[in-house]
């Protein structure tokens, strides 16, 4: 059985078209456009690509993006001062600081300084805490995007065994909270987990977010599972995920491709969060 492909490219286009319609409606009513501040420190090539994609998406949907391209030598206090300015700026609804940051800057301190109502990445402890308490507002973009992809399958997640490979603050941990909220039974695996294969074989829903090419053998996939591959790795000039795609697709019912799966959804949910922050910016 060949798995159905869950296209993040297609779904993200639909989401962004819907957001663009809403923003056009606000502007026609004489309101200002939503504003997103995008901060990049240093010249990491991957970060530059990600930031470029985010700015391009802002243009597509009608969000005004304000760019801050700062040198690698920027100090923590300099960055905190910019965040304080943006927190006070009534025309800025969302603040995004592209990670990773240079070693002289403490990422946690930066994230905590952002006004939780403008934390469109969904990383602030306040917003993660709200998700944990089952009252989410601004949600981490990648896990939120994964939930939207899972919705397209029509599968009821209640009682399904969801296995997450990777326990990062950006994907794995908030992903576990999203799946719990949806009624799944959740197992989170990480670098100290013994017998990873055994856990993966039990997964009705498998979400992999580690950043190691072909970490998950296609043979491990349970028949008719849903496989969400968050990993993005470059191998021999090609982008590949964390899951051995071809073999996994023979056993799974649904699978996301890399590229064109989770990546576009992360950016779409950032746009969605920015509109949400705009609508609630009082």
UniProtKB/Swiss-Prot annotation:
Record GO cellular component, one term: cytosol
Keywords: Amino-acid biosynthesis, Histidine biosynthesis, Hydrolase, Methionine biosynthesis, Multifunctional enzyme, NADP, One-carbon metabolism, Oxidoreductase, Purine biosynthesis
Family per similarity comment: Belongs to the tetrahydrofolate dehydrogenase/cyclohydrolase family.
Domain of life: Bacteria
Pathway annotation: One-carbon metabolism; tetrahydrofolate interconversion
Protein name: Bifunctional protein FolD
Catalytic activity annotation: (6R)-5,10-methylene-5,6,7,8-tetrahydrofolate + NADP(+) = (6R)-5,10-methenyltetrahydrofolate + NADPH; (6R)-5,10-methenyltetrahydrofolate + H2O = (6R)-10-formyltetrahydrofolate + H(+)
